[in-house]
Regions:
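Active-site microenvironments in enzyme catalytic cores
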Residues: 1-116
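Catalytic-pocket segment enriched in acidic/His residues
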Residues: 67-216
Length: 216
């Protein structure tokens, strides 16, 4: 399958989640494209990486995913992954140093809780030790002589969690509902909390590079 290929094949899955300054942080709404009827959170650790490919820190991330769109065709990955408010990061970037190292990332457990207004609760865990590719190998696949990021990048590392708990009835599986509160946490990286909305109803992304340079 296409998922097995990127899991154990020669090339990792690397894609653009959002443009610089396009992610949302702690407490913000996260967005689902209105066309999606089957979607899910993806609790992940994300690395802060310099333009030279040096990993300097880590944070938590939610790689909001439209499973029905991605499942239709691999060519729709951009539509499944990159929408308004579909990339969440936070609550802070913890820099590597005394008390926190690359080994902590590799051994980390990332917990997920989805709590719906309908009383539904979903819990899960993603263990970094079970991911088939090392953080360093993913960074090398993303940045290097073959592809540059002059201002650095934040790289989501993937997840081992896939929601299977039925929500609407036996065999119907999981999908988000508007108003779900998603909490992603790890002991050394805190907790990232967001509320699910439609991407068309989340605040539009208006602050880009031009506005940043104007403010400077």
């Amino acid at each position: 399958s296409q998922y097995l290929e990127v899991g154990i094949g020669p090339d990792a899955e690397i894609f653009t989640k959002c443009q610089p300054m396009g992610s949302v942080g702690y407490g913000a709404d996260i967005g689902l494209h209105p066309i999606s009827k089957w979607n899910n959170p993806e609790p992940e650790i994300a690395l802060a990486v310099t333009s030279a490919g040096k990993i300097i820190g880590a944070t938590l991330g939610n790689d909001v995913n439209l499973r029905d769109v991605e499942g239709r065709s691999a060519l729709l990955l951009g539509k499944a992954k990159d929408n308004n408010a579909s990339a969440a990061l936070g609550p802070f970037v913890r820099l590597f140093g005394d008390g926190f190292s690359h080994d902590d990332v590799k051994a980390a457990e990332v917990s997920l809780e989805v709590r719906g207004q309908d009383g539904f609760v979903l819990d899960g865990t993603s263990r970094m030790s079970e991911i088939s590719r090392t953080p360093e190998s993913l960074v090398k696949a993303a940045v290097g002589p073959h592809h540059q990021y002059p201002d650095g990048l934040v790289l989501y590392l993937g997840t081992m969690f896939a929601p299977v708990k039925d929500r609407e009835g036996p065999g119907k599986g999981f999908t988000h509902k508007i108003g779900d509160v998603v909490t992603i946490s790890s002991p050394k990286l805190g907790a990232l909390v967001n509320t699910v909305r439609l991407s068309t109803e989340c605040p539009p992304w208006t602050y880009g590079t031009r506005q940043l340079m104007s403010d400077l």
